[in-house]
Regions:
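Bacterial N-terminal signal peptides that target proteins for export
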Residues: 2-12
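Hydrophobic helical h-region of N-terminal Sec-dependent signal peptides
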Residues: 13-17
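N-terminal signal peptide c-region/cleavage motif recognized by signal peptidases
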Residues: 19-21
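Extracytoplasmic copper-binding redox domains, predominantly the cupredoxin/blue-copper superfamily
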Residues: 25-229
Length: 229
């Protein structure tokens, strides 16, 4: 009887330790720097997206949300929005003229059609990936919706600092993305119950070259489109 009781106590203790370890959540923090050509240094790094995926490839639960990218001043605001997959993004038109939001991304092409001031169109992003978005009327309008299959992500501050909160202890692959860095960057790391503090992580944008996108028909924008500025 004593052996059975002792074994049960040890089993209960092990289960308690495992439960506490599994529920332990920390914050992964660090800072991103952007390497650019002379004269092109960015002062705002809020377009940098950081996320963590379990190193073993385990699937994690995400919660879809509804968020907004406003069309104002012939710009997408914010220019970059990060969401969990299956989230809905609304595109309210706050300008005094019409817009036509579209994307040609293979896993999520869409076209809102032309709509006037005060109207809102929306799109649900079902698959993870980076979705460039444009306006078919205004050629300089470019934005991005970054859709992730993980709840562990953050958008950097102006100075490049980031903090991904609520990360369970374990091994992860850290991903960093910026639209001017073709390959992005990845880093494997172990997250303890208290999280992980990283140093400065450089992203190399020196190879970036601007290329004007085509309209939704795959054609060059007309001069009349440019005159709308």
């Amino acid at each position: 009887m004593l052996d059975i009781a002792s074994t049960m106590r040890r089993s209960a203790l092990i289960l308690l330790v495992l439960a506490r370890t599994a529920s332990a959540q920390g914050t992964v923090s660090g800072q991103v720097s952007l390497l650019e050509r002379p004269g092109e240094q960015s002062e705002d790094l809020t377009d940098v997206i950081v996320w963590l995926e379990p190193a073993a490839g385990a699937r994690v639960r995400t919660s879809p949300t509804t968020t907004t990218i406003q069309l104002q001043g012939r710009q997408f605001s914010p220019r970059v929005r990060v969401v969990s997959q299956r989230s809905r993004v609304e595109f309210p038109n706050a300008d005094s003229f019409s817009h036509n939001v579209f994307s040609k991304a293979p896993d999520g092409a869409f076209d809102t059609g032309v709509y006037p001031r005060g109207r809102t169109k929306d799109q649900t992003f079902k698959e993870p990936g980076v979705f460039p978005i444009y306006c078919n009327i205004h050629p300089r309008m470019t934005g991005y919706v970054v859709v992730l299959a993980t709840p562990y992500y953050a958008q950097a501050g102006e100075d490049g600092r980031f903090a991904v909160a609520g990360v369970p202890a374990g091994n992860y692959v850290l991903h960093l993305w910026h639209d001017r860095v073709a390959e992005g960057a990845t880093k494997t790391l172990a997250v303890s119950a208290t999280g992980a503090t990283l140093g400065t992580i450089p992203l190399d944008a020196r190879g970036y070259r601007f290329v004007q996108h085509k309209n939704k028909f795959g054609q060059e924008y007309t001069s009349a489109s440019g005159d709308r500025y």
